[in-house]
């Protein structure tokens, strides 16, 4: 969880306190913001600031990772109710986005903040929020990164475009021009973050209409335009990244913090090839709740007016609509997805300590299910064969289940269940088999000394005539110079012997395996799985250069196991 440094004197001013807060008062106030004092304060420094560390207890509220964000929420509990100001005035500034950036770092957002009074303390606070958002929320600048510039040195329109690595400019804190190639090799930030752009021949830069370089995102600002000093009053803030929501929220967090410091926000027009967007976000998001359901969930008897007051303390606007309440919340509240999230805000605003715990009416004791007992027994068998268990996500990339195994996404993959609203294509389908997943896992571990002997036992889901059948499969993958059909057959034979089962092998045309070195596994004339040496073309698709052999078994079809399939539609 993030830890931030604040000044007690500064925080007291931000929340408009009529006195200097004590450490205990500060700790009590920020507890409503899911935070606590992390250390004893140092004495006042030469500028009169008593610094203290604050531990933020939530990872999904990046708007709280600054003194300004904490103060904004605390002011709600102190009587400043409802949504913070989200307004912005239009500016003359535009950013034109080159379509080439889509392949590397496709999203950008920006805002202008005017009328600031920068001193050394405020610059350090600004750097702190920038660093916290870049490292934690932005995943060390991979998902998003923030740049701040002196807007008075920048001419519109700004261009976000791709350039060759031979392109030169003067990076921050350096005196001479350097090529981007040299920045990656010799500049501290280039060495630290250059890997983010390592797969691209060209890299993104920001330049203004007079070809002045603003920055090389997400690596380093330029020395001239990309430097904010105590003489700066008006700044441009931009965020770039690979995830649009992350980029927009990171911008919101910084601009809102500077608004709380007295800055006036102006919007920037982002011109993509196919559309135009205005940032920062200034429209609240909405969700409806039923107060009766909230009270039932929390075990409370709050009136509608009480609930409205609690929500306004948490900086929401509330509108009554018949028996429901329409909640309007800030666009940076990415943690709100469901009425349960709103109930959490109500509970915090009312004070968790006032909620009365109740003993459950039904007392039950849990135990391991028969199917889990059998799965664990099978795991012990495979481990006894010196196989290593791996556990992959049940959501996966459709390419792994199609193109990588030479089955394009068409009728041949109609059993694959797709997610309607995936966050990313990497997790957009539910796995329908395990062996391709193990091959993908193997492709990421080719640097480890061979042989590799891995297995997985887990659920798969198949779409069979619109019935979503959830099954439990077991798969084994052996990779090494000596792994053949014979070695994987020894695993199958040992498995079947320990289960006291007879089985048959029949020829199959499964293209995952080499012709003549593959088979269908049957028990009582019922197909239960497949086995064989992996086809070299499949191995090549995964970037595996060592022979591999594998098997996959549907455990729900083995008669003496208590592992059953179930129809998800009927749950």
Segments the model singles out, each with a brief description of its role:
Residues 1-2, 280:
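Extracellular ectodomain segments of secreted/surface proteins
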Residues 2-44, 48-110, 125, 142, ...:
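Extended, well-folded interaction surfaces typified by the phenylalanyl-tRNA synthetase beta subunit core
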Residues 79, 110-279, 283-286, 388-571:
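TRNA-recognition modules of translation machinery and tRNA-sensing kinases, especially anticodon-binding
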């Amino acid at each position: 969880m993030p830890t931030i440094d604040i000044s007690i004197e500064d925080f007291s001013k931000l929340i408009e306190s009529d006195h200097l807060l004590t450490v205990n008062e500060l700790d009590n106030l920020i507890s409503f913001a899911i935070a606590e004092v992390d250390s004893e304060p140092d004495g006042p420094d030469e500028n009169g600031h008593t610094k203290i560390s604050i531990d933020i207890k939530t990872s999904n509220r990046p708007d709280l990772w600054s003194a300004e964000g904490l103060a904004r929420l605390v002011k709600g509990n102190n009587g400043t109710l409802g949504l913070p100001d989200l307004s912005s005035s239009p500016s003359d500034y535009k950013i034109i986005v080159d379509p080439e950036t889509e392949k590397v770092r496709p999203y950008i957002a920006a805002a202008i903040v005017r009328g600031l009074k920068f001193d050394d303390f405020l610059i350090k606070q600004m750097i702190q929020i920038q660093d916290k958002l870049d490292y934690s929320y932005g995943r060390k600048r991979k998902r998003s990164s923030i740049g701040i510039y002196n807007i008075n040195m920048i001419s519109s329109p700004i261009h976000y475009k791709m350039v060759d690595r031979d392109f030169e400019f003067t990076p921050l804190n350096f005196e001479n021009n350097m090529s981007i190639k040299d920045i990656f090799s010799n500049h501290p930030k280039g060495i630290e973050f250059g890997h983010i752009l390592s797969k691209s021949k060209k890299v993104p830069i920001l330049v203004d209409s007079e070809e002045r370089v603003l920055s090389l995102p997400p690596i380093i600002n330029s020395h001239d335009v990309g430097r904010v000093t105590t003489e700066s009053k008006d700044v441009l803030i931009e965020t770039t990244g690979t995830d649009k929501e992350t980029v927009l929220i990171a911008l919101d967090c910084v601009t809102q913090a500077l608004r709380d410091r007295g800055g006036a926000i102006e919007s920037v027009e982002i011109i993509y090839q196919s559309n135009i967007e205005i940032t920062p976000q200034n429209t609240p998001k909405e969700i409806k709740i039923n107060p009766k359901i909230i009270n039932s969930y929390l075990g409370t008897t709050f009136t509608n007016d009480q609930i409205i007051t609690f929500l306004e303390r948490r900086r929401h606007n509330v509108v009554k609509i018949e028996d429901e309440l329409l909640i309007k919340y800030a666009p940076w509240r990415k943690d709100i997805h469901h009425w349960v999230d709103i109930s959490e805000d109500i509970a915090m605003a009312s004070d968790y300590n006032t909620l009365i715990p109740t003993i459950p009416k039904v007392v039950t004791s849990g135990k391991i299910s028969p199917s889990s007992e059998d799965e664990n027994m099978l795991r012990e068998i495979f481990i006894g064969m010196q196989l290593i268990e791996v556990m992959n996500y049940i959501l996966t990339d459709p390419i792994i289940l199609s193109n990588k195994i030479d089955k394009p996404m068409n009728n041949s993959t109609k059993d694959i269940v797709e997610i309607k609203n995936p966050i990313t294509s990497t997790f957009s389908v539910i796995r329908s088999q395990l062996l391709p997943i193990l091959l993908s896992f193997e492709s990421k571990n080719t640097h480890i000394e061979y042989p590799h002997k891995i297995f997985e036992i887990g659920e798969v889901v198949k779409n069979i005539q619109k019935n979503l059948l959830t099954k439990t499969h077991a798969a084994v993958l052996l990779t090494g110079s000596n792994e053949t059909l014979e070695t994987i057959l020894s695993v199958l034979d040992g498995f079947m012997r320990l289960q006291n089962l007879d089985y048959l092998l029949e020829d199959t045309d499964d293209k995952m395996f080499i012709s003549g070195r593959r088979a269908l596994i049957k028990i009582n004339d019922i197909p239960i799985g497949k086995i064989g040496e992996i086809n070299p073309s499949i191995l090549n698709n995964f970037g595996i250069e060592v022979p591999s052999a594998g098997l996959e078994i549907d455990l729900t079809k083995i008669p003496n196991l208590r592992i059953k399939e179930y129809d998800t539609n009927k749950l």
